[in-house]
């Protein structure tokens, strides 16, 4: 369930939607693409409500997990699913779809019910990219893919973004691997948006400060901190600096840059953690 969510997506960016299982990532993408009905609030595309608005929905595509055991895909072959997509999606790029089929070495004569998890993920990727939708949402697109296939996906996504300037929202739990793709990240936790921030700026704002407890507390006094870890007489904590802010009294502490994953974990931490 989502709570009091206010979110604006700008055109021409790749967003990373990051959250734990059950945080609401799939629910959010379903709402944005009008696949789930909202209970309150508005979802607008260029000022137009997207719900039951076919003109607006032409510009949105949500690529979600394919369940090969679903009756929807019972007996369906890959090539038949792609034919349905071509008929349904107004901007379908058949040439791109065929190119990606060869790129991923997919057998289009196979029945979807016989495909592995990785292969069904490849199909969701092909549907998303070949849809050519202005706003394209991908829900855990690399699930089941090995490291080589994941790198291939990141490359073709970046190539398509560079050529088209489309807006992509990619939900993932493999944060570090995809971090370089994201111009902005959206952290979702327990149905709420923790932050929506430029990725590079967020990395520059955050530092991990560690040392003796009294030295760390002096260094971060008055600053925004998260994820405190206490080990005996020592502690470590993430500090997030506002624009123009600097840390003082850092002579006796250790400062380290933080990865996107560690920033996310720190922001989602609740009470102080004693190790």
Over which residues does each language-model region extend?
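The feature captures the beta-strand-to-loop junction immediately N-terminal to the Walker
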Residues: 15-20
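Helix-to-loop junction immediately C-terminal to a conserved catalytic motif
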Residues: 33
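Conserved ABC transporter NBD signature motif
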Residues: 41-52
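ABC-family P-loop ATPase nucleotide-binding domains
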Residues: 55-58, 64-123
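Catalytic Walker B motif of ABC-type/P-loop ATPase nucleotide-binding domains
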Residues: 136-140, 145
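C-terminal coupling/interaction segments
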Residues: 227-275
């Amino acid at each position: 369930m989502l709570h009091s969510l206010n979110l604006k997506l700008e055109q021409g960016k790749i967003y990373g939607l990051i959250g734990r299982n059950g945080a609401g990532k799939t629910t959010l993408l379903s709402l944005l693409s009008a696949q789930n009905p909202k209970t309150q609030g508005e979802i607008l595309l260029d000022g137009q409500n997207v719900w039951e608005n076919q003109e607006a929905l032409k510009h949105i595509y949500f690529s979600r997990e394919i369940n090969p055991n679903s009756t929807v895909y019972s007996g369906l072959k890959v090539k038949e699913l792609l034919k349905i997509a071509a008929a349904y999606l107004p901007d379908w790029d058949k040439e791109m779809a065929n190119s990606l089929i060869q790129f991923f070495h997919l057998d289009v004569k196979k029945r979807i019910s016989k495909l592995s998890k990785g292969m069904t993920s490849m199909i969701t990727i092909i549907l998303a990219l070949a849809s050519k939708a202005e706003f394209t949402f991908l829900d855990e697109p690399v699930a089941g893919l090995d490291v080589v296939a994941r790198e291939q996906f990141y490359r073709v996504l970046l190539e398509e973004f560079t050529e088209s300037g489309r807006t992509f929202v990619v939900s993932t739990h493999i944060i570090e691997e995809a971090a370089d793709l994201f111009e902005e990240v959206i952290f979702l936790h327990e149905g709420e948006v923790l932050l929506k921030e430029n990725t590079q700026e967020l990395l520059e704002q955050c530092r991990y400060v560690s040392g003796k407890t009294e030295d760390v507390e002096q260094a971060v006094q008055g600053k925004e901190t998260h994820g405190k870890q206490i080990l005996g007489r020592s502690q470590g904590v993430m500090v997030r600096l506002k624009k123009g802010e600097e840390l003082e009294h850092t002579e006796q502490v250790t400062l380290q840059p933080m990865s996107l994953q560690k920033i996310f974990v720190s922001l989602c931490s609740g009470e102080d953690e004693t190790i």
